[in-house]
Regions:
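An acidic intrinsically disordered interaction segment
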Residues: 1-5, 61-80
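Hydrophobic alpha-helical segments and helix-packing faces
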Residues: 2, 24-27, 102
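Active-site recognition of the HExxH zinc-binding catalytic motif
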Residues: 3-19, 28, 32, 36
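Generic structural signal for well-ordered, non-membrane alpha-helices
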Residues: 7-11, 40, 104-107, 111
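Active-site catalytic microenvironments for nucleophilic, acid-base chemistry
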Residues: 16, 37-41, 112-115
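Second-shell loop/turn segments in exported
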Residues: 16-25, 94-96
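Post-HExxH zinc-binding segment in Zn-dependent metallohydrolases
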Residues: 24-71
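Pan-zinc metallopeptidase signature
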Residues: 72-175
């Protein structure tokens, strides 16, 4: 339940909107990261301070589920997100529910999120802020997300995501 609840909560945080689904795969990957993050946090918190003393034994189960999920994703050999994304961007834009691939992306996103969770998750609330139902390239989608974030820490997270995908934005090209 925790895993699915965190995933659906991720959609709420991201401001999910019906409409153009071209970049929905990215939101699905963020929501997968939210689930993995929630499992880790519950494992840590419940090992020290469970809601009920007899629930403390569940703490390692959350961590185990997270590990099993990540290890079950079996990355392709020498997986590099930026080059893999360039080769698979059309397939992703056509099918947001490629669960194994969403997991691969989520694990890479999680490595950034866990460095500074608060601004990372708060940045997600701006992900679909400028959605207008029109089709956007992934580069435009991320650029709009960056522009919508009002705080420096949020922008830093989005910039790290942009870099993770090896994307140059118009601002980079003008430097």
């Amino acid at each position: 339940y925790v895993f699915q609840f965190a995933h659906e909560l991720g959609h709420i945080i991201c401001g999910f909107e019906q409409g153009n689904q071209t970049n929905q795969w990215f939101e699905e990957s963020l929501c997968e990261a939210a689930s993995l993050y929630a499992l880790q946090r519950l494992s840590v918190v419940w090992s020290n301070s469970p809601p009920y003393p007899n629930w403390q034994s569940y703490a390692p189960e959350f961590a185990k589920y997270r590990i099993d999920r990540i290890e079950g994703g079996s990355y392709p050999e020498n997986f590099q997100l930026h080059s893999w994304w360039r080769e698979n961007r059309v397939a992703l834009s056509r099918n947001a529910g490629l669960r194994k691939q969403n997991l691969w992306i989520a694990v890479k996103l999680l490595s950034i999120i866990e460095q500074n969770p608060r601004p990372s998750w708060s940045a997600c609330s701006w992900l679909n802020h400028s959605q207008n139902g029109q089709s956007k390239t992934f580069e435009e989608y991320l650029s709009d997300w960056y522009g919508a974030c009002p705080q420096t820490g949020q922008k830093k997270f989005v910039r790290q995501v942009i870099n993770l995908f090896g994307i140059s934005t118009p601002k980079d090209k003008n430097k």
